[in-house]
Amino acid sequence: MVLITGMSGSGKSVALHALEDAGYYCVDNLPPELLTPFVALEHQHGPRKVAIAMDVRSATSLPLVPQQLRQLQAQGVTVQSLFLDANTETLVRRFSETRRLHPLSRGDTADQHRALVDAIELERELLGDMREQSHVLDTSMIRASQLQAYVKSLIAAPAPQLTLVFESFAFKRGVPLDADYVFDVRMLPNPHYEPDLRHLTGCDLAVADYLKAHAEVNDMFRDIEKFLDHWLQALVRDHRSYVTVAIGCTGGQHRSVYLVEKLAESFGRQWPTLKRHRELDAG
C-alpha cells in the first residue's frame, strides 16, 4: 500500500495518476478513519496494489494514521508513505496560475495573496506530524512528467530494503526540502572556471577527469562514503524506507553532479539507489 499526503498544490493528484498507471487501485481523499477497514476489505478480495491519498481537509483525523500504519505493518501489509512538498513561493504561483482556492483560505479577505500565504503556512503546521513520518518529495522544481517518473521509480524499489536517493542541487536555488542529509561541496575546485569545461556537466568524462585529479575531491567522496557506511545500518534499524542525501555546489552543474554520480555508483552495488540532478532535470 502507498499512502500519499502533502501540501495542497504539491502534485498529489499527479502522483496518484502515476500510481494508477503503474497498476495501483487508487482512492483519493479517503477519510483517515476508514484507512484500516478499507485495507482489510481490499485484502478480502486477494492482495492487490492500493494507493490512497489524504489531504489537509482530514487534518483533525490525520493523527490516527501513524498508529493505523503500524497496525497494518504488523499484519504483514507493506506500507510506503510519501509526503509531497514544495516551497511557499512555488505553491503560491501554482494556485495563482490555476486560480484555484486553497482548501484553508478565506475567500472573504481583501488581500488574497496574504490569505493564500497564511493558508499555506497553516497547512504546513497541521501536516507537520505526517511529514515527519513520511518520505518527503520536494516538487518545487520538477515538472509533472518528472514527478510521475520519480514516483514510479520509488515504488519500484525493493520495499523491505532501505533505498538511497542521491540528489545534486545548487545552493543559490535553495536546499531541497526532501533532504535528510546535506553536504556542501562549494569549497572544491570548480570546473566552471575552466573555459573548456564550463558548458559541460558532472556527468561528462572531461569534468570527471578534472575533479578526480584533485585530492580534496577524492577526500570529500571518501568522507561522505564513510559517514553513510557508518550510519546506514542504524537507519535500517529505525525502519527507514528512504534516505535522501543532497549534495550541493554553487550551480548544481559540475561538482555536486559528479559526486552524486560517483556515490550512486558506489552504494548501488549494495543498496537500492536512485539519483536526481535537480538543476539539470529542471532544464
From Swiss-Prot:
Displays ATPase and GTPase activities. Belongs to the RapZ-like family. InterPro entries: P-loop_NTPase, RapZ-like, RapZ-like_N, RapZ_C. Disulfide bonds: none annotated. It comes from Polaromonas sp. (strain JS666 / ATCC BAA-500). GO terms for molecular function: ATP binding; GTP binding. ATP binds at G6, M7, S8, G9, S10, G11, K12, S13. SUPFAM superfamilies: P-loop containing nucleoside triphosphate hydrolases. This is Nucleotide-binding protein Bpro_1300. GTP binds at D55, V56, R57, S58. Keywords: ATP-binding, GTP-binding, Nucleotide-binding.
